[in-house]
């Protein structure tokens, strides 16, 4: 039998020892793995618990980003050439309650959040999933503008004017292409403008000779857009709309270094109550005084509107203040009775104003107690001033609203009179209707303005190739007309009235100057209504001297009449030169 050497006898013992070590290593590894799994599970459980106790903030990404294109051009204003830079673009604004500091807070890292006190975290609003909500409103507006700046001018020595139309729900295409931009679309003076091609020409009456110009589209109109939760609520209303414009103006002044420029507002139609709220807001809330505010076709107190005042019985002023416009319209269309029609309009209107504020106002104030003979006498006098039949006036109880007047002034020839401009007429749509079914002036010129701007903004300003321009939105049903008056803590439930805002702004800044402009043939916002509002502002008598008045033989869009365009340009330019503190 073979004998084993000593080495051979030791090998089995070494193998047994190695096996024991290998088993121990494997067991240890298995145990470590199990422990690691348990630790990881416990860690995940703790992490989940911590996640629920310490929510991670959900930051709200922006809906929009600012953008712009820049071009250059030249305009000749009353014989003087002006080189300008044009910027077409957008700025992002947020609703009231938005705070950039809170926005930065929303974007903090988790580690930074974990260092905050737990009681502070517990107070923050939670979502159903336990995530922390953003402190800020999520709605945003991207507001479109076109700015024209005179080349090589020092900003501190150059006024800047922010212009906007009204609606509510209107873009600013009208002021831009009809009034003060460097290019102007040609439309017929008092009749329907033929279809395209439209003629766009150098604007001899651009306001660039007096001021840099920023045409701004309200949120949701033109190329402006809104987005986010409750977007309509956050931007479609008297107060949120004015706040958006205030935020836009502040952002514009900052972006383009215009804080030390003389500053103006120019608002038309609903742009006038917007201006009243806006100037007061800028001066009180932003410490930003303005040099002046220009109001075109003003309505500050909606109780004075001649659009269906019969729905507000007992309020007689709309009929009284509209009467001079009825008389001017009858004069223009040769509807005044008798052979001796007044040769000049203004003296005739002074006579009508006196009758309106005295005999007519007293008669309406008497209501049902007005004696029949007096009622008959007032009806005959109204016939003299309006051309409407005495029988119709008596049937209307001496009270005729704007739509009824537009339908009946030229009813004998089945023609409807314009609302925005009574110089315009168009075929009556429904001869049996009580009031006008459309506005012949709007129908006559809207296509020219919208078509011309859509062509101009893309070809000349190189903006909007992939976007839709919205000239107007129907917002009357969704617009929040409640307004929080200065000094009040909650919105008023009365009809919108921004006269207190304008008065507050004038008292807060007693150097503020106001220009009121209106057209004699404006049936939407009768000129005498604006006069009445200004003379009833709750301001000291000396501040009344800070308001100047200009009236033209045109309508709501005064500039649609070329002679009136020149006149309003000259008046606005003189107003700016007299208030810009540049010592010219």
Please report, for each region that a protein language model flagged, where it lies by residue.
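N-terminal cap/lid subdomain of alpha/beta-hydrolase-fold enzymes
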Residues: 42-57, 98-234, 535
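A catalytic-pocket lid/entrance helix-loop region that shapes and gates access to the active site
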Residues: 182-186, 279, 283-384
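Alpha/beta-hydrolase active-site loop
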Residues: 208-211, 218, 235-254
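Alpha/beta-hydrolase fold nucleophile elbow
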Residues: 258-269
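Glycine-rich nucleophile elbow surrounding the catalytic serine of serine-hydrolase chemistry
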Residues: 267-280
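Alpha/beta-hydrolase fold catalytic core
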Residues: 363-524
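Short alpha-helix in the alpha/beta-hydrolase fold that links the catalytic acid
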Residues: 512, 526-536
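Catalytic histidine-centered segment of alpha/beta-hydrolase-like enzymes
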Residues: 553-564
């Amino acid at each position: 039998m073979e004998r084993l050497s000593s080495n051979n006898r030791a090998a089995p013992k070494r193998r047994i020892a190695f096996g024991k070590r290998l088993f121990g290593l494997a067991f240890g590894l298995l145990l470590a793995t199990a422990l690691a799994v348990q630790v990881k599970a416990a860690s995940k459980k703790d992490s989940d618990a911590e996640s629920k106790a310490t929510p991670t903030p959900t930051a709200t990404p922006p809906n929009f980003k600012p953008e712009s294109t820049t071009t250059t051009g030249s305009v000749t204003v009353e014989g003087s050439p002006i080189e300008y830079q044009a910027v077409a673009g957008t700025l992002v604004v947020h609703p009231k309650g938005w705070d950039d500091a809170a926005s930065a807070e929303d974007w903090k890292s988790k580690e930074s959040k974990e260092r905050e006190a737990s009681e502070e975290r517990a107070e923050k609003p939670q979502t159903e999933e336990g995530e922390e909500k953003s402190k800020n409103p999520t709605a945003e507006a991207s507001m479109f503008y076109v700015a024209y700046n005179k080349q090589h001018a020092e900003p501190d020595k150059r006024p800047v004017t922010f212009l906007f139309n009204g609606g509510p729900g209107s873009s600013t295409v009208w002021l831009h292409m009809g009034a003060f931009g460097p290019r102007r679309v040609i439309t017929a003076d008092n009749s329907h403008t033929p279809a395209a091609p439209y003629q766009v020409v150098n604007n001899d009456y651009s306001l660039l000779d007096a001021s840099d110009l920023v045409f701004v589209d309200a949120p949701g109109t033109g190329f402006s857009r809104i987005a986010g939760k409750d977007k309509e609520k956050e931007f479609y209303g008297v107060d949120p709309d004015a706040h958006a414009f205030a935020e836009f103006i502040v952002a514009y002044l900052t972006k383009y270094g215009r804080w030390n420029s003389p500053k103006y507002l120019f608002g038309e139609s609903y742009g006038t109550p917007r201006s009243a709220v806006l100037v007061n807001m800028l001066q009180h809330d932003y410490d930003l005084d303005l040099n002046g505010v220009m109001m075109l076709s003003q309505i500050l107190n909606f109780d004075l509107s001649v659009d269906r005042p019969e729905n507000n019985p007992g309020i007689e002023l709309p009929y009284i203040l509209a009467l001079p416009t009825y008389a001017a319209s009858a004069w223009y269309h040769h509807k005044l009775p008798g052979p001796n029609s007044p040769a000049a309009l203004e003296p005739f209107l002074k006579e009508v104003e006196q009758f309106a504020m005295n005999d007519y106002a007293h008669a309406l104030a008497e209501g049902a107690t007005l004696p029949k003979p007096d009622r008959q006498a007032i009806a005959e006098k109204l016939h003299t001033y309006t051309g409407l039949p005495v029988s119709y006036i008596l049937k209307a109880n001496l009270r005729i609203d704007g739509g009824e007047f537009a339908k009946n002034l030229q009813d004998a020839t089945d023609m409807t009179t314009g609302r925005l401009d009574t110089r315009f007429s168009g075929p009556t749509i429904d001869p049996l209707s009580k009031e006008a079914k459309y506005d012949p002036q709007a129908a006559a010129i809207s296509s020219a303005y919208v078509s011309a701007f859509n062509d101009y903004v893309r070809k000349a300003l190189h903006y909007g190739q992939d976007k839709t321009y919205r000239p107007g939105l129907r917002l009357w049903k969704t617009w929040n007309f409640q307004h929080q008056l200065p000094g009040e803590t909650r919105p008023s439930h009365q009809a919108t009235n921004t006269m207190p805002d304008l008065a507050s702004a004038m008292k807060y800044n007693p150097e503020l100057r106001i220009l009121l402009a209106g057209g004699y043939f404006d049936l939407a916002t009768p000129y005498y209504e604006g006069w009445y509002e200004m003379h009833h502002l709750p301001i000291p008598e000396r501040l009344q001297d800070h308001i100047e008045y200009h009236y033209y033989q045109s309508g709501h869009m005064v500039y649609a009449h070329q002679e009136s365009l020149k006149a309003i340009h000259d008046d606005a330019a003189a107003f700016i030169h007299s208030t810009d503190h540049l010592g010219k």
